Amino acid sequence: MSLLDKIFAGRKPPQDDLQQRSRDAPAAVDADGTEIYEEDIVSHIMQELERRRNERAVLELQWTLNANFLAGHQNCDINIASRRIDDEQYVTKADNERRVYNRIAPLMETRHANLKSVNYDMVVEPRSAEMDDYAKAKVSTKLLAYCQGDTDFQAKTDKLISWAELTGTAFTLSFWDPNKGDLIANEGAVCDEQGEIVQPEKPIRTGGLDFGLVSSYEVFPASLCVQEIRDQHDIIIEQVRDVGEIYDLYGIKLQGHMMETYVLTPMENAMTGHGRNNIAIGMSKEQVEDVEKVVTYLENPSRDYPKGRLVIVIRDAIVYYGDLPAGEMPIVAVKSKPVAGQFFGKSPIQDLIPLQRTYNRIVNKIQDYVDTIAANPLIAPEGSIANLDELDATGIEPGTILIYRNVGDRPSFLQYPDLPSTVLSERDHIASDMEYVAGVSQLMVVGATPSGVTSGTAIDNLRQIDNTRMSLTADNIRDAVIAMARIWLRLNKEYSSGYRTMQIAGSDDAGYVYTWCADDINSYDIRYTAENELRHSKDQQRQDFVQALQLGAFTDDNGQLSKSAKQRARELFMGDSAVGDAFTLDELQRKNAARENAFLDQGVVPERYRYDDDAIHLEEHKKYALSMDYRLLRKAMPQYAAAFDAHIDAHEQALAQKQNAMMQQMLAAQGGAAQNG
């Protein structure tokens, strides 16, 4: 019995679906009504793919070199003639060091850590001043928050930053996944004439939005000199995917092949001195098994194709031909450093590589100097050492007895001059230049200030300069996320049918269920709820808060600090996680009142609780009553608004009764004091 028979227990192994297809019928009709055959479409796409691959080859080599230097495989360079990365094999003495002292990795890790701190909470602006548009903008804002949580946005953004920093550009591809969402029904299994199941039972779901990451290695634009995706005629994406993943995505069973793809793999780092070959991790092409190429052709909308074109080709066969999702290019580019007039961005590693080579050479020369001194070289008259061959092979080890002839001066250690300070200064200068090129400083990398900088103001200025330079990349990422969010809204509007529900967590630690439909999406004007943190960092916010506090901006007429200012101070100086532990009773009352406001939007009318602080609840409820959300609620659900007004009246009556009771107690106390007097 074969291995396949054991796996499938006597059942037929999966057939290759593409081999059973007929390709005689036309695949599509162009704008003039001419029939287009599958063979012609596939041939055109594949020819374009190879042309673009040749044009992009040098850039691909640069990305691979970037990956090698980041991983520590640095004794290599680009061979333009052979179009590959070759190890540097120049001849040196056996004892000369050629080690790698990787400074690129910690610098890039510092950049990554700072870029991860950026916030991506978004809000959709209403299309007009109409009440309905405000309500729809609120639904769209909640929908974006839901999509971020449902698509594992944070983890994917982390990988997105890594790829953008490595190659200069990373891409996101948003799509509608019919296998996500709530279960509607199950499609029955399909059997052949013999009763064997040819298509198992399949669940039918409402569908949901998702997005994936695409590396620069997989993207082939129509022109390398057209900077924006919207200005490209089309883009081709070539991916090597596992056949199981292809079946999950497209429902097509394939027998996989062995293909080449880029992977990080252990590789020799050339001769490093003393006859040793070190192993380092580097980027290279390796063979992977049971995979197949998936080629995706995306054409921007044009006069002939107003909704664009999307063609998916697997093994020279079209598995999908149609319009772009929602008639818009679903791919977004995230660039670390945009280059004017170029489609692909630039990685900081590319500018760091020449400095890293120089740094390695300088430190290796210093190490050669140290090794030479540590070898204890001798100077002796000719013929004075009897066991010269043995001594030359082993050197002077601890405890060695040196036998020499008294034929002149006795052997002595060779005196070397001190290492010139210029060498050490140059090493430090190169290290400083690398920090400058990477957009960071010693303050950001190791927390140490440059020599001679002791002033607090100067240190704050250095920190602000670092954040400002890093914020350029952060702004590029934030702009790309905004563009992706617009695509999300359009995909939801295009593919959502009927009324749908989404569960999200609110800012007051409560979960909410929102009901919406595609008609609720009518605005694509999106902005962030907060400024780029790298432009206005947490430290800068603390400093601004202290300055405003000193000016009396947070004190009332009696000179007392307001409760909201105290809460803001806890958030800035103690962190968000410590705020909940530091809540006073008044702050808990305020949080409870805000939760009642939010529940009202879900149809839950609040009731006055015996432990409610009426004054605090009145303040929070009246704030909500003056907001646009309450105006929308009053229009949509007037009965709930009336109940909420009655709830406010109940608090006012209870507060008035308490105040009257306190007044009576004060008058009674004053009257008793007068009688005693």
Model-assigned labels for residue ranges:
Residues 610-622:
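Short amphipathic alpha-helical heptad-repeat segments
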Residues 134, 138, 154, 166, ...:
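Conserved structured core elements
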Residues 279-452, 456:
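Extended, charged amphipathic alpha-helical segments
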Residues 178, 455-593:
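Extended amphipathic alpha-helical segments with heptad-repeat/coiled-coil character used for oligomerization
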Residues 1-316, 374, 390, 422, ...:
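Extended, helix-rich architectural segments
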Residues 143-150, 352-376, 426-441, 473-498, ...:
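Generic, well-ordered alpha-helical scaffold segments in large soluble proteins
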Residues 562-594, 628-670:
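Long, highly charged low-complexity segments enriched in Glu/Asp and Lys/Arg with interspersed Ser/Thr
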Residues 554-560, 604-611, 629-636:
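Charged, low-complexity interaction regions
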